[in-house]
């Protein structure tokens, strides 16, 4: 059994105009597929550790040293992208009441949350991700990670994710990352965010 590249839960062009079909095709079929292939290649060297990436990345010290960085990069890349696709919706959704209340409690207002999340996504130098997570205390927190690092490795449970690698937006938005972030907020799958939030609490 190997890690499998999940199919997108919608057509490649379903998120247009916010996310264009060419970017989605390259992002899923090339970038994500490469993370899956490289993660499988690393895992094949140590079949004794299994293939549960969430468990492995929750405590990277348990990953054999010769494949540790490869799994952080590629296992993380797979988990991050598999989650990211599910957090996007072709149909515009309103934020669910439970998540809206939790955001108000944690950040004061949705606008304050959006401003802080945007700052995390804009301020991530180079490649990485912006996240809304449930931390170890059960509280909402905004964070960002470099490269394909996952908040799971810090004991946090991601409920919203934004890929800020240039490959995620450059064809459509060029170097204007803030416009890409703004577009992201128009296509969030809030039902999925709520599902993850309820499971993480």
Swiss-Prot record:
Its EC number is 1.15.1.1. Mn(2+) binds at residues 27, 81, 163, 167. PROSITE patterns: SOD_MN (PS00088). Destroys superoxide anion radicals which are normally produced within the cells and which are toxic to biological systems. Coiled coil: none annotated. It catalyses: 2 superoxide + 2 H(+) = H2O2 + O2. Homodimer. SUPFAM superfamilies: Fe,Mn superoxide dismutase (SOD), C-terminal domain (SSF54719), Fe,Mn superoxide dismutase (SOD), N-terminal domain (SSF46609). Pfam families: Sod_Fe_C, Sod_Fe_N. Keywords: Manganese, Metal-binding, Oxidoreductase, Secreted. It is an enzyme of class 1 (oxidoreductase). Binds 1 Mn(2+) ion per subunit. PANTHER family: 37S RIBOSOMAL PROTEIN S26, MITOCHONDRIAL, SMALL RIBOSOMAL SUBUNIT PROTEIN MS42. It is found in: Secreted. One of its GO terms (cellular component) is cytoplasm. The lineage of its organism: Bacteria, Bacillati, Bacillota, Bacilli, Lactobacillales. This is Superoxide dismutase [Mn]. One of its GO terms (molecular function) is superoxide dismutase activity. Its cofactor is Mn(2+).
């Amino acid at each position: 059994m190997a890690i499998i590249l999940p199919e997108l839960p919608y057509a490649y062009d379903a998120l247009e105009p916010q996310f264009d079909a060419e970017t989605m095709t390259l992002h899923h079929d090339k970038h994500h597929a490469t993370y899956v292939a490289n993660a499988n290649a690393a895992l094949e060297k140590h079949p004794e550790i299994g293939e549960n990436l969430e468990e492995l990345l929750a405590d990277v010290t348990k990953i054999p040293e010769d494949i540790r960085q490869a799994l952080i990069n590629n296992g993380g890349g797979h988990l991050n992208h598999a989650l990211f696709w599910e957090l996007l919706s072709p149909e515009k959704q309103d934020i669910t009441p439970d998540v809206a209340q939790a955001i108000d409690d944690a950040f004061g207002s949705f606008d304050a949350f959006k401003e802080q999340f945007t700052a995390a996504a804009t301020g991530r130098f180079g490649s990485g991700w912006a996240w809304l997570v449930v931390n170890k205390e059960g509280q909402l927190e905004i964070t960002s990670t470099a490269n394909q690092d996952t908040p799971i490795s810090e004991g946090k449970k991601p409920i919203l994710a934004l890929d800020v690698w240039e490959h995620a937006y450059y064809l459509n938005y060029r170097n204007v990352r803030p416009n890409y972030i703004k577009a992201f907020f128009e296509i969030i799958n809030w039902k999925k965010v709520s599902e993850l939030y309820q499971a993480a609490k």
